[in-house]
Every structure is written in structure tokens, then in C-alpha cells.
């Protein structure tokens, strides 16, 4: 087949904090099916994936495990690469952000952007989410928590370098409007435009000083380069980009990328930050960024503590690699989230793979052996007008499917493409019911018609298997082997009758997919859930013990104040208060106003803890209150006491609460 040119495809690189679950692996399987399909179409495909290995979260994970960050990422990167191999992923490059050539290029990119004025030095003060490694302003928080993951954020203030995002915002808006295919699906484009670009971009923090596990800034080594500027550039460093203008021929051939395939949760970074970085470097933008939906577990996000995390290796061990590939590709809608449970995988395996496909192949080969010793000949005989009609309809369905599949794949509607392919197998099964080979076999005069029917079935199956290859490569090869033929190139799939007449199929057909006992499936799932919950509980206990040991080892010295007399202390009245309601003080960035029940009274107390607690988190807490503090107005709001807090060396505040449950109003003495 004549080459159609290059096709450069990437996935988001996997974060090496922990072993990924099947929801994470979905993306790499989706990308692999696209890469394989494009290769069969005649494109010169380069498929890159890899691992994102820097950041504070990894540093903390390694510290908790008592190993170095490099040891941690080496281990997890090995696990991720092993899962790629297990899932039969045909990547061309596996990049790691700890690769020496990548790190050097990131440093050169940072220096170049700094030298040309796109990066400047400043100071950052805001709310930081460690799991997402993202800074947020208070206005961006949702109920006081990270808008991306819903996790706890902490105030952070540090010297940092910033990228001038607003400088390129108008250019990016123009590009998006002029290239409607750039962000897909369209709903993701609308989200980026309305929520981020049109309201105005803020400058982006691109370095950190509060941790060390990252790529140092060459001219200011106490700073490490922020994860997104590090991770995103893998798409160009992995194919030979050089910030000094000495990029490789491979880079010149492959860039711009034809497709960045990513999860919908990181589309902002890939459709705003990344294209702006490229504009600053004077490089073309990727042709398309596709934000795929999530694969949920039983309708909810996967959680180890709930015991509902599903790992690819467990699924493959039980169902087989192609059954897993088929399920995650077939069950993921174009925009909405998909759903996975062991029961659903088993049901789909039984209905589509064991019955529709496996039974069809087995019956066809078995009948060929039974009636003709395995020899398949094209007699091209129709005995009746109806024979001609059903043969023509079968051939039209089989040869017309390729164009439909190509159209679906052009839109990245992979699930729909698979549905079209299985339409061939369903039509073949219907053809068996229409032609009734077992009836034809009873009449020797109809032997040539019987041979024609079996030939048509074999021809339909091999065309379907050839289309199926990008999605289920092992299964497609097994089918071709049993039919004693080869999988076909795509330019042959609109022709019917290329199977060599007189070929002999295997005399021992194998079961492609065995039917599964649903009771056994449920038992296996329950065993894994129980083991996971137990492991999660043990892990939480270990973390709690580690935190306790760490707390015992930590101590803070503060500057002592002047001594006071006991009588001075005795003047202060401390009581337990219960917060019954709380709200933010208007026009204040720091203050919360709480209604606090103390005995039979309710007092209004204003506290500067908005950066540490949301109003919702405050309600219901038992706190220690200085009751007889003289009332005062804070930001125009009357405060009738003081809620006590502890403060660590980093300025983090924690409410002081009684160790045991005490009634509101109990005296603290």
C-alpha cells in the first residue's frame, strides 16, 4: 500500500506516583488501536507514550517508602512499561522525563523563554494542591477545595518564575476559532474558551522551591522547573527537538503532532498552556487535541479504600488481553464517561466474543471439516432467487463495512467503529440461519450450494478479522491462522472473493473465547475487593504510624514572650464552643464569621482562617474559645471572642479541639 505520509500520535505520559488502574490504561489502549489502524491505512506512524517522573507528590511518596525519588520512579516506570507490554501496546517510543536528553532540553527551553522575556521572576502566594501539583487563587476554589480533584489545598508562598500567559492569549483564541478541529470533542473546546480564555489568563507559575525532585533551573538552581513545563515538552523532546535550533530530521519530519490523546481532566494544560509554550518557541501547534472521557468503576471513580480499583493485569489474567481491549474500547462513549465492572466485562465477553464471534468461527470451520474435509471452495452457486438475494446482501454488508469504519475512525469514534465491524459477524450468523447448511448437506444435489455458503462465510470472517486487527490483534491472527490464510491489507477489504478457493482450514478449531460462569466471575471479583480493602487499611495504618512518628520527631521553637503572673492568666476564660454556622466575611480574603454555641449563649466570632478551612468544614466542630476577650470589629463585623488555633513553621493553621467529646460551654482549665 502506498504511504499516506506521517502520523505522529501521543498519549499523556503516565504519572509515576503509583501503579495505574484500568481507568488510566484505557487511554493507552485507545491510542494503540488508532496507531494500528493508521498503519494499516498506509500511514507512517510514530506512536509515543511514556512516564512523567518529577514533582512534589513523587518526592513525598518516596520519602514515605524510605527510598530515593529515582528508585521510586524506576520501579513504577517499570510497572507501567510492563502493563503496556501486557496490553499489547505497539508504541514506537517510551520516553521518561528523567531521561538525560529530555532534562537537558527542558533546561534549555526554560532558559530561552527567560532570555526572550516570556518568563520572569516573582513571588507566588496562593492555594496549592499537592496531588494535582497546581496553584489556585481563592476565587478558583470550589467549596474551598481543589477544583480539579476536590482535595484539600494549603496556602503557599514562595519565590517563583512565571510565564506571561496573557501575552499569547489572543493568538490562541484566534487559532482555536480558525481551527475547529483543534480541540475535540467540541464540548471541551467550549469549556476552555468560556471558563479560561475569554475571562482572561493569569500568568503561570513555572518553578518551585519548596521541593527538590525536579529539573533545576540552570541559572538559579534552588528552583526546579514546574511539572507542566517539564512534562508537556516531552512531545517534542522525545522526537529530537533542540531549543538551540539543532533539531533532528526526525523532529522536522514528525512535528507538528497529528493527535494528542489525553484525559478530559488535563485538557486545559494541553489546549492552553502547551500551545502557548509552543507559540513562544516559534513552533507549530499540534493538529488536534482529543480529551477522552473517563472509565468509571460501577458508575463512580475508582478508590482503593472502597475496594473498587480494577487493575489491567487482574483483568487480563482472568479474561485475556483481547477481551479486555475489546471491552474498554467498545464500552467508552465518545464524550460521556464509560462504566466497568467485572460482571459487565463478563457479560460482554459472553455475548459478543464467545457467542457472536467465537461461535461463528467455530461453527464455520467445524461445518467445513464435517462436509468437505476442511476444503473451502468457491463454487459460486445460487439455486434459487432467494439464494442470490441473501448472497448479495451478505457481500454488500461485508464489503461496505470498511468505508463506514474509516469514517468512524476519522472522528475517533472507536466504539462505533467496533460496532460496525461486529455487524459483519452478526450478518454472517444471520446468513447461517438463512441458508441452513445442515439442511443443504442432506441433499447431494445441493453440495455446490453448500460449498458456496461455507466459502462466503469464510470470506466474510477473514474480512471482518482484518478490520478487527487494530483492536484485537491476537484474536485476528488466531482467526486467520485457523482459516489457513493471512490478514488482508485495507485496500483489499472492499473486494469479496479473494480467499483462495481450495484452501484447507484447520481440522482442530480452537475456542477463541470460552463462555464464563457468572458465579465464578462474582467470586473472583469479591476476592479481589476483599484483598484490596485489607491492603488499603494496612496502608492507611502504616501511613498513620509514619505520620505519628514524624510528628513525635518534629518540634518547633518560637521566640519566648515575657513571663506573666498566674493572676494574669486567671483573668482569661476559656470554654469549649460548638460552631453551629459559618460564612465568609464579604470582601475579605482571610476572615470567616462563625456562630458559636457556648453553654446557653451563641456568640459571633470572626477568625482569620479562611485560607485553611471552608465554612462548610467549620460547621459542627468543637473548638477552644477565649470567651472574655473584649469585643471588636474586624472588617466591619463584630467579633465576641477568639477561636484558638495552632500554627506550624510553614504558617499552616489547625483548630485546637478537645481530645474527647465535651459539651459546648465546658470550662478549659
Tell where the protein language model's regions lie, with residue ranges.
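N-terminal catalytic cores of NTP/NDP-binding nucleotidyl/phosphoryl-transfer enzymes
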Residues: 2-76, 95-111, 115, 132, ...
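Structured secondary-structure scaffolds
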Residues: 2-49, 101-105, 155-370, 417-421
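A glycine-rich helix N-cap at a beta->alpha junction
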Residues: 78-92
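Short secondary-structure capping/junction motifs at helix and strand boundaries
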Residues: 88-96, 114-127, 139-140, 154-157, ...
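Cys/His-rich short segments
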Residues: 116-169, 173
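Helix-rich, typically C-terminal accessory recognition domains appended to large enzymatic cores
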Residues: 121, 344-380, 397-505, 626
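Intrinsic disorder at enzyme termini
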Residues: 476-568
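Phosphate-backbone binding interfaces of nucleic-acid-interacting proteins
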Residues: 548-669
